[in-house]
Amino acid sequence: YRGALLLTLRAQYQEELDVLSQQVTDLARQAAEEDGLTLTIEEQDVFPETANHPAGVERVEKAAQALGLPVVEMEEPMRGSEDFGWYLRQAEGAMFLLGDGEDHPPLHRTDFDFPDALLGTACALFQKLI
């Protein structure tokens, strides 16, 4: 017999994810040994946490304030940044979002329509950052 178990592990911090991954691996190995099974573990699409660097956050805040843009710190972490964590391991950067108000469908919904009016704001903010 052959079987497969697919799962996604997520955690707020890399250390928590490492512990969780080890626990799942240990449990799977134990179960396989008890039943005389061969276990193969593959990891795909592994990505690190996106942890903004304080200096990067400060630069974004100063640029936004210079343009008169409100800065709102999110109450909860956002995990929608699969690749950006790699960049932040190399540079003192910060991932930030441009809000378009509350009366718009969120990204990844079929009725999402990018608000073109944000382009000018985005360009001005990036110009301040460079």
Task: Report the location of each language-model feature.
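Metal-dependent amide/peptide-bond hydrolase catalytic core
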Residues: Y1-I130
